[in-house]
């Protein structure tokens, strides 16, 4: 994991702010993009299972489902207003179209990503993995979200000759240049989705 503008990642920041009472919520408000993917659905489950988060907003093309292993009553979380999901058109991301969803949140989590094969072309892949992510981050920054946490990839490098690591590296550079108060970038290796395609 790499962090920018901070000596602490989000978990360390939470620990420093904690009162020590495990039953007391820190009241962190989070917005998550990419909650229907392999990492995103697990992150959504972790956020909802944590008492540290008082509100989780999810943006996506379709509604996300919390994996059963987290023991979260998704319907109850939605009814209480702690979990709010909004379907959005990622081709139309701007302050005007989604700014209200980002407003008043403390941290923007982004696990959005695809593959060239799934996207259908190099251009479509770049649009999803780069443009959608950076456009969402710009909105988050513009409305005052102080922290961004982005799931990139092992080997990300903006100067790479290869599409996937180059795109991920370009996103990392764009996020650093947006100058959030806290920028956390995670570079996992291969993902084990737990099933065979």
Task: Give the positions of each predicted feature.
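NAD(P)-dependent short-chain dehydrogenase/reductase
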Residues: 193-197
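Short, polar loop motifs at secondary-structure junctions
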Residues: 59-65
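Conserved Rossmann-fold NAD(P)-dependent oxidoreductase catalytic core, especially the SDR/UDP-sugar
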Residues: 36, 62, 114, 119-186
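N-terminal Rossmann NAD(P)H-binding glycine-rich loop of SDR-like oxidoreductase domains
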Residues: 24-52
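Conserved acidic residues
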Residues: 54, 106-109, 146, 181
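NAD(P)H-binding glycine-rich loop region in Rossmannoid oxidoreductase-like domains
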Residues: 30, 72-135, 139-142
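Conserved SDR Rossmann-fold cofactor-binding beta-strand/turn motif
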Residues: 186-192
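Eukaryotic N-terminal low-complexity, Ser/Thr- and Lys/Arg-rich leader segments
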Residues: 1-28, 69-78
């Amino acid at each position: 994991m790499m962090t920018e503008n901070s000596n602490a990642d989000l978990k360390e920041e939470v620990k420093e702010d904690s009162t020590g009472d495990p039953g007391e919520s820190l009241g962190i408000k989070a917005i998550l993009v990419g909650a229907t993917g392999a990492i995103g659905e697990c992150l959504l489950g972790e956020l909802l299972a944590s008492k540290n988060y008082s509100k989780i907003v999810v943006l996506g093309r379709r509604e996300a489902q919390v994996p059963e292993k987290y023991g979260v009553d998704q319907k109850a979380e939605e009814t209480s207003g702690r979990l709010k999901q909004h379907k959005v058109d990622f081709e139309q991301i701007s302050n005007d179209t989604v700014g209200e969803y980002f407003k008043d949140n403390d941290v923007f989590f982004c696990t959005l990503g695809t593959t060239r094969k799934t996207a259908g072309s190099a251009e479509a892949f770049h649009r999803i993995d780069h443009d959608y992510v950076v456009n969402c981050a710009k909105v988050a920054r513009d409305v005052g979200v102080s922290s961004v946490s982005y799931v990139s990839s092992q080997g990300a490098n903006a100067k790479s000759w290869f599409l996937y690591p180059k795109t991920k590296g370009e996103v990392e550079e764009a996020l650093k240049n947006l100058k959030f108060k806290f920028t956390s970038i995670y570079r996992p290796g291969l993902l084990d989705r737990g099933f065979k395609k």
